[in-house]
């Protein structure tokens, strides 16, 4: 909105970082593109830090092509159409105040539609209601191979916390993963990726 205010969420980036660490430990060539989070990323070889959805989209394009894309970032669907040059003051805006929004790039959909589409594309879906219905719809509409779905409530502390519980949704399979550390979730996802490629 301006140099002080922004549209964001409570996502810590921890789940994506844990997946990147796990894959790197399995000797995969990993690049982590991560948003503006306060997270220690020691040990990760290739890290690209970005501030916006547009920068993240550009970084993904520049990083490719790749064999696997794991889109765990909680990217905002919208951004202000224009950023104010100075802090917006109450005295200067009058009543009522409207914030005009425009859509951000759909990074997951763009990856799935690319000519050099990765062999495996995994998206994430954080939902507040109708988890399975919305996640299955996202799997279909985005064109990805898997969706890792988790329900976000005020009580769950999934977003920004150290634990998670998810459902891994494929076209013909759904695997419910019990609540555990995000490191544990990452290891399970990585194990399933290895199974997918090596059988």
Put a short name on every predicted segment.
Residues 1-2, 34, 42, 73, ...:
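Residue-level signal for pocket-adjacent positions within structured domains
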Residues 1-14, 42, 74, 117-138, ...:
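Glycine-rich phosphate/diphosphate-binding loops and the adjacent beta-loop-alpha structural elements
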Residues 1-52:
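Glycine-rich phosphate/diphosphate-binding loop of Rossmann-like nucleotide-binding domains
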Residues 3-9, 41, 77-80, 90, ...:
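Generic structural "secondary-structure junction" signal
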Residues 4-8, 45-48, 83-87, 136-138, ...:
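Short, glycine/charged-enriched secondary-structure capping and boundary segments
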Residues 8-26, 88-107, 143-149, 179, ...:
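Gly/Ser/Thr-rich active-site loops/lids in small-molecule metabolic enzymes
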Residues 51-125, 129-152, 156:
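Glycine-rich phosphate-binding loop
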Residues 116, 130-199:
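Glycine-rich phosphate/adenylate-binding loop
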């Amino acid at each position: 909105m301006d140099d002080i205010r922004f549209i964001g969420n409570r996502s810590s980036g921890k789940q994506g970082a844990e997946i990147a660490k796990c894959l790197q430990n399995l000797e995969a060539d990993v690049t982590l593109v991560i948003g503006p989070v306060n997270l220690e990323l020691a040990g990760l070889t290739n890290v690209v830090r970005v501030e916006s959805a547009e920068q993240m989209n550009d970084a993904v394009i520049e990083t490719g092509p790749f064999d696997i894309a794991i889109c765990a970032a909680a990217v905002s669907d919208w951004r202000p159409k224009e950023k104010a040059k100075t802090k917006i003051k109450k005295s200067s805006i009058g009543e009522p105040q409207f914030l005009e929004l425009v859509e951000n790039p759909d990074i997951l959909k763009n990856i799935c539609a690319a000519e050099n589409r990765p062999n495996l594309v995994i998206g994430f879906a954080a939902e507040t209601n109708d988890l399975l219905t919305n996640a299955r719809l996202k799997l279909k509409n985005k064109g990805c191979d898997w969706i890792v779905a988790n329900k976000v409530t005020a009580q769950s502390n999934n977003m920004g916390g150290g634990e998670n519980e998810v459902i891994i949704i494929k076209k013909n399979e759904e695997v419910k993963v019990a609540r555990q550390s995000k490191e544990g979730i990452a290891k399970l996802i990585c194990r399933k990726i290895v199974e997918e490629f090596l059988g």
